[in-house]
Design a protein with these regions (language model features):
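GIY-YIG nuclease catalytic motif and its immediate N-terminal context
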Residues: 1-36, 42-52, 56, 63-66, ...
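Short arginine-rich
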Residues: 67-79
């Protein structure tokens, strides 16, 4: 069974990048190696993996990645810190950064 990952990395400028992959270690190395000069993380190296979630279904992973990409920085930090209560509160109140 194939496993897919949605991940968040913290960049050197303290911003976050959310991505999707089927090989987490390879993808994080690619971000840090800076192979694509047009990538968001290219000028923000090094990056640090701060969150990931595994999926067995590729479509669920893609939906979750799109959802997280639309979140505020505060929501991303809530999930990174495993603070589901805060995430729920931020979602309910639609608080912005």
């Amino acid at each position: 069974m194939k496993i897919y990952y949605v991940y968040i990395v913290k960049c050197s400028d303290n911003s976050y990048y959310t991505g999707f992959t089927n090989d987490l270690e390879r993808r994080i190395n690619e971000h840090n190696d800076g192979l694509n000069s047009e990538s968001y993380t290219y000028t923000r190296k090094p990056v640090e993996l701060v969150f990931y979630h595994e999926f067995n279904d590729v479509n669920q992973a893609i939906r979750f990645e799109k959802q997280v990409k639309g979140w505020s920085k505060k929501k991303k930090e809530a999930i990174i810190n495993d603070n589901w209560d805060l995430l729920q509160l931020l979602s309910k109140n639609r608080m912005k950064d």
